């Protein structure tokens, strides 16, 4: 009997090493390398297992780009316009999609609803390894979903799943979840780095060779990132994250990698008694402001994927009783907040060194683009002076370290979106000022932070 081989794999990034060492050379993490035993297999079987990854098993040949037959890939809808938007316009045949999210976010519910919709028109297969078939059927009954056409399978062996799928010939398949799947050639427990990597590789290879779209459910760590080795995200074609806790009825689906569409595309859903329902106008739920004007609140226009989104940002500036005042940012980068406070002090003359500063993006949206800088500065100024901004004012623009206001992409589209939602005034960078203006909208163009503060005083 052939002797099992040993390998040493980093639990964070999945890098391989010939022997154990304290630090991973690939990602720099300490004490993350563990031993993995690989079952010995015949060379022929191993070569067959590794061949044909990017397509069918036909004879490979070298071609020039001009010789490749370009055909429009026919996408099919998932039944959710928001999910289709995040995926780039629909589901591509043969794609491997990794969907992650916190426990209770609604990953299994979203995929079950999608599969029940697709089962009416094409063969489908839902593979569950975490729940029994009875539990999935109970959820489908509770949600009022049709159960006649969707085929179910309770299995955790990737080899048997691929064998059954070869017999059933589904066009789309769900694997729930990758952390409980195992490959026979890897002698380690399910969920380990080696098992997750080999299982994802086998499922992606099956998707490419058979032109089957595969949804793979993945767990997340306590900091909200996808669990497992980083190589997992390199193997699959599309990576999306469903965000939203059990205390929030709204869920946001964001793409972090997409070989067939735009990244950072955002889809919004609402969790109801009948499952997830898409939100056609996300700006409305993020702008649920009170009737009275309050200080420390401003509205910005952020660009999420391929569409603008109006989001409210709130700031609270108050005298601190601590030696080191607190700086808390929810939905924004902490370092960005510290940077803007320094710019306000240097170029705006506002001293907040003895103030506690709390910033929150309403609705649980996470904003990463720099177009939110000017709106955040205006919210801080409003709270510091205890003077509210008018409700019909929208603000966007990037703030530089020298106090200059830099332009942002798609300025005209942002203003049009704000005007469509009833905003009559705007503070924008001078370079984003429309040439002909917008009828019915008063636009203040600013080049420096001092000009933005003057515009705040005029509104």
Feature names for model-found ranges:
Residues 2-12, 16-85, 92-98, 105-123, ...:
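Peripheral, non-AAA+ core regions of ATP-driven protein-machinery
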Residues 133:
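Divalent metal-dependent catalytic cores for phosphoryl transfer on phosphate-bearing substrates
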Residues 102, 129:
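P-loop (Walker A) phosphate-binding loop of NTP-binding proteins
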Residues 124-128:
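Conserved RecA-like ASCE P-loop NTPase motor core of nucleic-acid helicases/translocases
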